[in-house]
Amino acid sequence: MRLRFAIALLVAAALLGCAVPRPEGPVAVKILAINDFHGNLLPPRGGIRIRDPQDAARTLTVAAGGAEYLASAVAELRAKNPNHIFVAAGDLVGASPLVSALFHDEPTVEALGLMGLEASAVGNHEFDHGSTELLRLQRGGCHPSDGCKGPQPFAGATFRWLAASTVDARSGRTLLPPYYVKRFQGIPVAFIGLTLKDTPHIVVPSGVAGLEFRDEVQTVNALVPDLRHQGIEAIVVLIHEGGQPSGDYDECPGISGPIVHIVEQFDPAVDVVISGHTHRAYVCRIAGRLVTSADKYGTLVSEIDLVLDPVSGDVRQASAHNLIVSNDRFAKDAAQTRLIAQYERLAEPLAKRVVGRVAAPLSRDESPAGETAVGQLVADAQLAATTDDGAQLALMNPGGLRASLAGDAGGVVRYEDLFAVQPFYNNLVTITLTGAQLQRALEQQWLDQPRPRVLQVSRGFGYSWDAARPPGQRVVPGSLRLHGAAIDPQQPLRVTVNAFLAAGGDNFTVFAREGREPRTGLMDIDALERYMAARGTVAPGALDRIRRID
């Protein structure tokens, strides 16, 4: 596999050096793009919410996504133009539903290969299990611990992961190729792949050990002269970083977030930016460039149309729109159905195991204070699992909660439902913090202003925060309480978090630097399963543990 890949790169380089006749007229190119697929081989529960075309004040839920429907949508769009390419902006794997995660996301890699994906940026979730595992997914081979669990030996990705800004700290070389070049009627187009530079702060340290994540702008701008020296003028960036728009899925009013500043600083030679990470949908013009994002889980495909100049080889025109991968409009792709069915049969004994019931769905929608019903459940489960280690309260990062918990129509909850909520296999860790240290940790919830991360808290613990105060001063002094009693700043507390938070993930550095006497416990999903089994039926409670003051 490595030899074939190396030969392919050499051949591509040789072809770039050949004199290929330029076309007589402009060349139309169609780029199809997705992002943040996260192993959603089956349509995600909840589909996608869009503005009601009949009433702008309302929204509609459209059943969308899933590999079977995505493959059909891509095939239909691809048929419109023989000059096409299918690409992605990262997080194709990681935080995946059970049918993919149980097999280390090999099913997703195979499914995307069947769709004809050609290149993708590496996202932060591609590092959930470390760079060695990412390279295995690229090159193929059995998992080092679990072996080959799938219906056939795993051959690796047929598409190319790109990592221009991810560098081996020892060698200084990129972990994976920095870009991919494809010719359309003789005109080369470069696709540069970027991982967000904040990846070390949102992935467990073991996942990024030995790697450097360099500045996105500096990386791209340094590559531009080399690409242009090769005769490449059309440049597309695939970046796993994004923004927060305020409009509908095909609009871009008032976009904010890191992508804006990044795109504004790119070399003018960059023509199109395909983004992701924020799980939002938009089609924008930023600093004169086309910028797209296609929501998440394969619910949308960005359809990007370029017109290449036959003389300069540069992009003359660029336009785009986001297409909903509607489960009503598109038929299931037969090859995807067969692939998924193979893995579903293997996963069924575990996936369909009944673990409990819900009296009503527990949503991950946030209250004004930042609480969620499913977050409360998980925090309570983690506290219950660690009381024997002296735990007095538990805190859960919202990014580790990937879905609401609804069960089936009768409220029956199966293991696959729990896994959809907590797919990371994090151990629980109980540490000692003083009241003052706990307050400092809570202040770190607002360090990342565009994306505050309000920790979910267990029953019996609560506090107030003031939205009018600046970050670092938002927790109301004296408001921290445990079972109704005020927490003294010097009071030692046993606090349970998951291993990701214990290592300082999401910039919660207090847990890593100041937590004492760590004790490792169950896996998070095991704690949740035990909690559900012990209670039989759970119901959403009042979202009143955290109080927001405006």
Where are these regions (language model features)?
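Bacterial N-terminal signal peptides
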Residues: 6-15
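Acidic, metal/ion-coordinating pockets
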Residues: 18-330, 335, 342-345, 369, ...
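A glycine-rich phosphate-binding loop feature that marks nucleotide/adenosyl-phosphate handling sites
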Residues: 322-324, 358-364, 394-404, 457-466, ...
